[in-house]
């Protein structure tokens, strides 16, 4: 059994810890922060808004919030981070000042009307490019009034932006989504003194009566990052793996449950139940079978590219449906998955909200065929999850990835850990 502490702090929790600290009044401590490019964008924006950030240890910070959020004299650069842009939009909607949020070409092409509409329901003054569809976003902070909103999509980022505005609005606001999305925002904010109640699937959010409590958070390992190595184990014969200190929030382990249904042996060992459930995950290789995925999409949307690799090793036709939001990520992930697999000669096809993949009962003929020519070049589309998913496939097939460096957005240690996996040894530090 190989033990692996991937030392890849959870991306969702890292973002939220930084952003929520701005609603506190006293210094907050964030330990084991994810030093990926996305989370560093949130940290830099906090500094631009007046927070004092001090490095206290490796990957750990003391964040002293400003007495009042400062109006910046420059654009707030979210780079490639949709979480930064959407959550800061909610936070800043009620703050005094003018704020402009922008990002790289990829982020500025991603849909933003999904947060502009609910924020406008509060009376927020927010504008986006091309009739509010895209960033850059301009926000003129103003007083907000409570509202009720039913989201047409299940999105933790949309929900979080709404909650951050609701905490600063006059009156109690209500939020409903058609499917449960990640709930870290509700869990963290409630632990810090926010009044957020779930009434029959409807979130009731009361305005803050006082600043959030100061906190000292240690971030657990990211299940989305850990899943890449669960996939590696699942497709590598005779392999067994122990992933340590992983966040086991039920809204974050759906991909592991899907892999389990496909035939992989997966067990959880809970180590603590404090703010979030944290524990270890045991994975053992076993033959995989095809699967159809059309439910709980919001809980596994980020892992679907990796699951597509598992589907390649699963006998029969696997299907993904109701996942249209994959087209609005860092790349069109439906197109990215299918075009790369087709380039390898795999039978697959895309449709508007998903794709199908005809799995291979035996991958060795494909490996032999590819070994007789120059390794195919996988197109990452500069999307970290596409790059890492197909990098795992290099464990079984001779491939090259055009830009594996984009993994640094969410998982800076990925390339090194993958090389260690190939050698059969790990050191997550």
From Swiss-Prot:
- Is Nucleotide-binding a UniProt keyword of this protein? no
Pathway where this protein functions:
Metabolic intermediate biosynthesis; chorismate biosynthesis; chorismate from D-erythrose 4-phosphate and phosphoenolpyruvate: step 6/7
PROSITE patterns, A to Z: EPSP_SYNTHASE_1, EPSP_SYNTHASE_2
Q: Which CDD domains does the UniProt entry name for this protein?
A: EPSP_synthase
Q: Name one Pfam family in it.
A: EPSP_synthase
Where in or outside the cell is it found? Cytoplasm
Q: Which reaction does it catalyse?
A: 3-phosphoshikimate + phosphoenolpyruvate = 5-O-(1-carboxyvinyl)-3-phosphoshikimate + phosphate
Quaternary structure?
Monomer.
Q: What is this protein called?
A: 3-phosphoshikimate 1-carboxyvinyltransferase
In its UniProt entry, the species of origin is given as: Helicobacter pylori (strain G27)
């Amino acid at each position: 059994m190989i033990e692996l502490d991937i030392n890849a702090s959870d991306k969702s929790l890292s973002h939220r810890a930084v952003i929520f600290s701005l609603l506190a009044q006293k210094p907050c401590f964030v330990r084991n922060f994810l030093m990926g490019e996305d989370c560093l964008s949130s940290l830099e924006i906090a500094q631009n808004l007046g927070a004092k950030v001090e490095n206290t240890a490796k990957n750990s910070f003391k964040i002293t919030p400003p007495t009042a959020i400062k109006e910046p004299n420059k654009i707030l650069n979210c780079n490639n981070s949709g979480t930064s842009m959407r959550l800061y939009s909610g936070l800043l909607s009620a703050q005094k000042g003018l704020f402009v949020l922008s990002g790289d070409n990829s982020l500025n092409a991603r849909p933003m009307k999904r947060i502009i509409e609910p924020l406008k329901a509060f009376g927020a003054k927010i504008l986006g490019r091309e009739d509010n569809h895209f960033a850059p976003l301009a926000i003129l902070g103003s007083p907000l009034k409570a509202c009720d909103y039913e989201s047409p999509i299940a999105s933790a980022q949309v929900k979080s932006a709404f909650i951050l505005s609701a905490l600063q609005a006059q009156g109690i606001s209500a939020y409903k989504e058609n499917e449960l999305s990640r709930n870290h925002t509700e869990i963290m904010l409630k632990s810090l003194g926010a009044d957020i109640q779930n009434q029959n699937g409807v979130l009731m959010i009361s305005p803050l009566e006082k600043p959030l409590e100061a906190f000292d958070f240690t971030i657990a390992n990211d299940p989305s990052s850990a899943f890449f190595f669960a996939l590696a184990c699942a497709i590598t014969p005779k392999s067994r793996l122990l992933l340590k200190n992983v966040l086991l929030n039920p809204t974050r382990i759906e991909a592991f449950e899907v892999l389990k249904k496909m035939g992989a042996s997966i067990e959880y060992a809970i180590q603590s139940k404090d703010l979030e459930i944290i524990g270890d995950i045991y994975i053992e290789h076993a033959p995989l079978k095809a699967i159809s995925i059309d439910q709980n999409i919001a809980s596994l949307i980020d892992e679907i590219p990796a699951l597509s690799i598992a589907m390649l090793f699963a006998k029969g036709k696997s299907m993904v449906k109701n996942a249209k939001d994959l087209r609005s990520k860092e790349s069109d992930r439906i197109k990215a998955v299918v075009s790369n697999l087709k380039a390898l000669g795999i039978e697959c096809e895309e449709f508007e909200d998903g794709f199908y993949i005809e799995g291979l009962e035996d991958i060795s003929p494909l490996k032999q065929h590819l070994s007789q020519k120059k390794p195919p070049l996988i197109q990452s589309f500069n999307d970290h999850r596409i790059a890492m998913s197909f990098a795992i496939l290099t464990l079984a097939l001779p491939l090259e990835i055009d830009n594996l460096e984009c993994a640094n957005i969410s998982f800076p240690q990925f390339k090194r850990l993958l090389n260690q996996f190939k050698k059969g040894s790990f050191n997550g530090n």
